[in-house]
Amino acid sequence: MAQNIFRGLGVALITPFKADGSVDYQSLKRLVEFQIDNGADFLCILATTGEAPCLTQEEKDKITELVKDVNKGRVKILKYCGGNNTAAVVEEIKNSDWSGIDGILSICPYYNKPSQEGLYQHFKAIAQVSPLPIVLYNVPGRTGINMKPETTCRIARDFPNVVAVKEESGSLDQVDEIIKNKPDNFEVISGDDALTFSMIASGAAGVISVIGNALPKAFSRMIRLEFRGEYEPARKIHHSFTELYSLLFVDGNPAGVKALLNDMGFIENELRLPLVPTRIATKQKMSEILRTLNI
């Protein structure tokens, strides 16, 4: 029976770009080292925050190899593989090289808006061919469909290689319902930085974080404090990020965190269309907050 190995701080890695629009592989190397050196427990690559829909297959392959090479097995790697064409996702899983990868993150089918039974059958097909543990990804704000707790738990019970769900419904009631009814070998992972403190307090195993790209040390400390039951110092860290949580997403993701990383000197402030950089006023406000953070 597979066990969830994705606990603590997972960072949803951005993909840095140069001014000419090409992938900035040197900055990506530095960013991976920065994450590992500052408390990231695992890395999540080529998902939404990594702007994967705007990358070529060649770029995705090169990013995968780079992250594996820089990581050298120090932390776990979760790689995205999902879509709204079940057969295509199944074929991609069957035909991909998964060496050096520890798990697959797979989103609920978007745009099609399947029923709960359709969601179950989609993930059943994936689970039956996957050579690696699977983390489900429920994000209704992007997919247009919410996977209900009973569906999540049904999948978890029926397919032991489905080890967790990245839950980004925004509903703490839904999180509690999953945690209450899930099998013992299945975990809930926060997909929302702002709700991570509350979700871990309710029993979540960690987070796949956006803010962790820029502030992994402080965010991982908050999580570790919570795991030890030291809620007051953890709460102080959480509250210090309250305004930043909102600003990071006001102009879209990963525009906010890329602006923050640019301010820190890590990357150029570049995205690929249809995404554009965050507004100047938003960037300036985040810069002010960054300078005042006592972390």
Describe the residue ranges of each PLM region.
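Short glycine/serine/threonine-biased micro-segments
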Residues: F6-G10, I45-T48, Y80, I101, ...
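Catalytic alpha/beta core domains of metabolic enzymes, predominantly
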Residues: Q128-V129, R142-F249
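A general structural signal for well-ordered alpha-helical segments in protein cores
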Residues: L28, K60, T64, V89, ...
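Active-site beta->alpha loop and helix N-cap motifs at the rims of alpha/beta catalytic domains
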Residues: Q3-G144, R154
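Glycine-rich phosphate-binding "P-loop"
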Residues: N138-V139, N161-V162, R272-L273
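Short secondary-structure transition/capping segments
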Residues: L55-E58, E91, Q116-L119, M147-P149, ...
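C-terminal alpha-helical cap/extension of soluble enzyme domains
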Residues: G8-P16, F34, N38-A40, S202-A204, ...
